[in-house]
């Protein structure tokens, strides 16, 4: 029985770790912590849109769209258990990050961003949750590629 639900432990463990880390870094940022270097600055920006401030014209309505999308993904994953079992850590990271950004939208009116990468070019300001979402998508893609290769090898 315990082995059957191991993926739930991994999902919620990743969810809580990413959520807590993102909120902790955001709390340091909101408390005024700043740092500058040649490549990366820790600063403060409030993003009222999504990536690269897209959809910021939706203003406060964006948080309800964000809530609906996260809700649909939660329902879909718990309905499609095989997908959740296969990618439990990645989806835990993704949803922990998404819920952390959603909390920001309700509390601060936008998402708290702090990392500004600026060596040779000015990249968008981002946060820990954004990094975790990108890592989780990369994990899912890598797992799917290796799963397909393993399946193809068995057919040979």
Curated annotation (Swiss-Prot):
GO terms for cellular component: plasma membrane. One of its GO terms (molecular function) is aspartic-type endopeptidase activity. Disulfide bonds: none annotated. It is a multi-pass membrane protein. It is an enzyme of class 3 (hydrolase). Pathway: Protein modification; lipoprotein biosynthesis (signal peptide cleavage). Its main location: membrane. It catalyses: Release of signal peptides from bacterial membrane prolipoproteins. Hydrolyzes -Xaa-Yaa-Zaa-|-(S,diacylglyceryl)Cys-, in which Xaa is hydrophobic (preferably Leu), and Yaa (Ala or Ser) and Zaa (Gly or Ala) have small, neutral side chains. The active site is at residues 113, 130. Keywords: Aspartyl protease, Cell inner membrane, Cell membrane, Hydrolase, Membrane, Protease, Transmembrane, Transmembrane helix. The keyword Ligase does not apply. The chain crosses the membrane at residues 5-25, 64-84, 89-109, 122-142. Its EC number is 3.4.23.36. PANTHER family: LIPOPROTEIN SIGNAL PEPTIDASE. This protein specifically catalyzes the removal of signal peptides from prolipoproteins. HAMAP family: LspA. Belongs to the peptidase A8 family. This is Lipoprotein signal peptidase. It comes from Campylobacter jejuni subsp. jejuni serotype O:2 (strain ATCC 700819 / NCTC 11168).
